[in-house]
Swiss-Prot record:
Protein's name according to its UniProt entry: Zwei Ig domain protein zig-6
Keywords assigned by UniProt, alphabetized: Disulfide bond, Glycoprotein, Immunoglobulin domain, Repeat, Secreted, Signal
Disruption phenotype: No visible phenotype. No defect in the positioning of ASI and ASH neuron cell bodies. No defect in the positioning of PQV, PVP, RMEV, HSN and AVK axons in the ventral nerve cord.
Glycan-carrying positions: 91, 142
Subcellular location: Secreted
Cystines in this chain: 47-102, 145-196
InterPro entries from the UniProt entry: Ig-like_dom, Ig-like_dom_sf, Ig-like_fold, Ig/MHC_CS, Ig_sub, Ig_sub2, Immunoglobulin_dom, Neural/epithelial_adhesion
Species this protein is from: Caenorhabditis elegans
Amino acid sequence: MTKLCLLLLPLVFLVSYSFAEEEITISISPNANPVQKPIGHQISLVCSIKKTDSNGEKPGMIWKKHGGLDRTGNVEVKKLDDYTLGLIIRNSSVEDSGVYYCQAQVGSKVYMNKMDVIVFEDIVFRDKQLHFGQVLATASVNISCEVSAKKDSVITYWTRHGKQILEGGKHKFYSRGSILEIQNYQPEQDAGQYTCEVFHVSSGSSNTKTVTLGTTGEKNYVACQQMCNSFCTDVHNKVFTNN
């Protein structure tokens, strides 16, 4: 009987030790993960340790981020109590985006949790005009998709009726592609909708704007012409494909 007790003692100790590990939890608030905020907003994270055992040992707690917390100078860490550590990002920038780790050490054991933070550029168009109405033939028309973000941090993609607009011929781009110039404007050819989509490279945020040129009659004429061309092309392809 004594030998059996001695054999079971390590097993009992192992079970008790594992159970003690499960009683320690580390959590980060807010509960939403990732945290997403526009540039310039304040972001607050709170890391908490829940410890139900009674030995009274206080955890050592730190915040970490790949590349360091002090790259932008916007991050401040505050100890709220022995089991709670806060992190504040003031006047947040895109560079403050990333994965933030809260690490706690209790005895020889290290616990960790993480929170994804995404700071995105709020893409706002400077020119609000969406319709030009009647445009004189042979005139030059400029359509602006300039935004509040820095020009070198965005990419602008232009389309007309679903097809990409490339520079050349009567189309020219200025201001790193944010302004489209249509030279020698011809209503029966150039009227219609022009769409730009602006992408912010670092944060991945985007915005879309559609500008309409020409009167209703001119737009309908161009749309009808495009439908006819598309129909003729389909018929032509089917005839020659079957032959």
